[in-house]
Regions:
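Extended, hydrophobic alpha-helical segments in both membrane/secreted and soluble proteins
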Residues: 191, 204-209
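Short, hydrophobic/aromatic alpha-helical segments in well-folded domains
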Residues: 81-82, 123, 159, 179, ...
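Internal transmembrane alpha-helices of multipass membrane proteins
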Residues: 18-31, 36-135, 199, 203-204
Length: 209
């Protein structure tokens, strides 16, 4: 299905393709709004290709541990893929934040249930670092909303682009909040210390994703 959408002309227009939007919490400006452009579609295709490759690569290892664990593993990987697609397709800043943070849940269980001997320590460390970055990002997300035009669709990226009423200093602090959250996930120095434990203890497919 993802590859079929490539037939659409996603690169010849500034308009998003396959766009869909529904108000969810209009009092707070939150909408379910998704759509793709050329970049988003490329990332979605990459996620759609990598996930089955990771599942096939881990098939024998997980199958040896029993059918119930196999079901949990494949379910977690598919949930993670769904959240990744949501991150790439979201056109509402708050919805993007929800998908971005929701990815922590399947990754935490992938490490904690299917990792190496120190998997619990690695999973908790990854979770704490990511939650700390996510909370800082949430502050920036809320600040962006109040600096924007507001309204029932105040979190839509198209409404926020070029319409933030804030001082240069405030905008810099908003950027810092997003940067810290992305730096944790990247990961970048000095917030990278969760990486050696997580990638060492995580199952191979989890590390790839």
């Amino acid at each position: 299905m993802v590859l079929a959408t490539q037939k659409g002309d996603t690169g010849a227009t500034e308009q998003l393709q396959l766009a869909e939007g529904h108000p969810r919490i209009p009092q707070c400006g939150v909408s379910y709004a998704v759509g793709v452009d050329g970049i988003a579609l490329s990332l979605i295709v990459m996620a759609a290709i990598l996930t089955p490759i990771c599942l096939l690569a881990a098939w024998n290892d997980v199958s040896e541990e029993g059918y119930s664990r196999e079901k949990r593993y494949f379910a977690l990987m598919l949930v993670l893929e769904a959240f990744m697609v949501g991150v790439f397709a979201a056109t509402d800043v708050f919805l993007f934040y929800v998908f971005f943070e929701a990815m922590l849940i399947p990754v935490y269980f992938l490490i904690g249930l299917f990792g190496g001997p120190r998997r619990q320590y690695a999973a908790v460390k990854f979770l704490l670092f990511s939650l700390a970055g996510g909370l800082i990002m949430l502050v920036s997300v809320i600040a962006v909303y109040f600096a924007g035009p507001g309204g029932s669709d105040g979190f839509l990226i198209e409404n926020l682009t070029g319409n933030l009423d804030a001082s240069p200093e405030a905008l810099r602090w908003m950027f810092v909040g997003f940067f810290i959250a992305f730096a944790v996930k990247a990961p970048m120095w000095p917030v990278h210390t969760w990486l050696p434990d997580a990638h060492t203890e995580a199952p191979t497919a989890g590390s790839v994703i």
